[in-house]
Amino acid sequence: MNELEFVTKHRRHLHQHPELSLHEFETTAYIKAFLDSLNIKYDCPLETGVIAYLEGNGSHTIAYRADIDALPILEENDVPYRSQSDHVMHACGHDGHTTALMLFVQRCKDMQDAGQLPQNVVFIFQPAEETGGGANRLIKAGAFDKYPIEAVFGIHVNPFADEGIAVIRDEEITASATEYRFFLTGLSSHVADKEQGHSCGEALQHVLTQISQIQQFHLNGLKRNIVHIGHFKAGEAINTVPSNGYLEGTIRTYDIDDLTIVKNQMHKIAESVKLLFNVDCEVKFAEGYPPTINSPKLRTQIEDALIKADLNVYDKPTPFLFGEDFSFYGQQLAPAYFVFIGTRNEDKGFVTGLHTSHLNFDEKVLINVINFYENLLNNYKEV
């Protein structure tokens, strides 16, 4: 089987059998069976996910990461390899990321067997990127303590860039992702005696209005930030004063100072609800992923490796505003660099975005990814 047949076979198998974050048991077994077939040793620090290692001839150790989880989305692609799991789909391309790393493992094993593997390589098949912070979990579990990793590399398919294009950016390339929730508690009464109640309905309207004004009045308009309201609710019946209210959303920013401003404003909003409406209001934050920071020291190696892989490099002027837990590797483990690989092909209908029910791409783009990985390995220099 040639390499294109390899990536097509394995990617489509994984696409048919997607699993949600922290439940990637079959996917993990599939990866382990593949590694076993190559006689490669590996560790499983968590219930799902795999860390493999190959010793090379050099003194440097570098790591490559692929995320392996899927999303709770009903696939609508009419293809033979459509998801066989109800309402679970590889709608973010992690099946491709995993497959590319599998083939790269095989290439590295062939090099090792020939005595030509230039450096030590750690292969990270990471669980729970979507909703579990799998990268942080692995680091906290000590998964990398025995490896003197000097750099971590990763990619993500990008349906907004054409095939043959690699999108890069030094410093911030993805935003932080922080969830927030407002909890309101008032006093119910019949609508005929509404003056005896403390309405969470009007209080929630106030919260909505104030949140929508944070971006306009408190953040620098030249920076890209998102303060998004995703869901809200007040009350249970049409003829009673609402005694409870709830609102939740997400904050996306690549500047820690801006995130602090948003949080401070939300705390002030919660305090104002008590004063204005006599309604208790609490805001809670679920810390998500920090911004992904690409080390400028790795830029030259990245760009050279991409060009040698026949990819055209596009330097993105601003970060993406979605979150990515690859950020934890650069924050806690070693200098890191994350690249987006274009998969858009209008002739083949591969045009829909990430996290959509029609996401798909041509497996041939994965060969470019593997060539990029190998170029990095062959020409790696410590930074």
Curated annotation (Swiss-Prot):
SUPFAM superfamilies: Bacterial exopeptidase dimerisation domain, Zn-dependent exopeptidases. Its EC number is 3.-.-.-. Coiled coil: none annotated. The keyword Transcription regulation does not apply. Pfam families: M20_dimer, Peptidase_M20. Belongs to the peptidase M20 family. This is Uncharacterized hydrolase SACOL1433. The lineage of its organism: Bacteria, Bacillati, Bacillota, Bacilli, Bacillales.
